[in-house]
Amino acid sequence: GIRAVDHAVETYLSIDANAYTDGACLQALRLLGEGLPRVKADPSDLDARLKCLMGAWMSMTGVITGSRLGASHAIGHILGGSAGVPHGHTSCIMLPYVLKWNESVNGARQKEVAIAMGRAGVPASDVLNDFICGLDMPRTIRETGVEEDDLPRLAENCMLDDWTFSNPREIRSPDQVMEILRMAW
């Protein structure tokens, strides 16, 4: 599902991206962008399920070849491990906000994400937000039952996750993580 979309997006935008991972991840986004809404509409649609299966498999190309991911995954690890938010939900919540926060450093590549998702000319953060909303998945941290008072502790804990430091836009302090968490609140 959206976890695979998150893998594809963060691999494509990774500081370790390369021609091999780029091709696999953009194709994964095309497949998932078509397949996921179709499966939601008709769970018995086997062609749509195959597209999702292939997209999910291709989305892992970067991870299995050593590409480091970014803040969506890093924050997601902490939301899951420290606050009990299901792993798939962390991607639904964090990915669009991380894209928006990172746009100043990888906006051109984010345009390719939007194109792969079939929405050229729309900011990737909006494309993913709309896509996730269309699947009726959670979009804010608030929806998960996490308390706002917990955000500073979660931001501190994010500094313990290696992928915080491989985010395309440099993160070096909990205050920067708090900027993203507040967007997602």
Predicted features by range, described:
Residues 113, 119-185:
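C-terminal charged capping/lid subdomain of soluble metabolic enzymes
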Residues 11-127:
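Active-site segments that bind and position negatively charged phosphate/pyrophosphate groups
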Residues 8:
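Conserved core segment of the aminotransferase class I/II
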Residues 5:
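Conserved phosphate-interacting/catalytic interface
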Residues 1-2:
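ATP-dependent small-molecule kinase catalytic core of the GHMP/sugar-kinase superfamily
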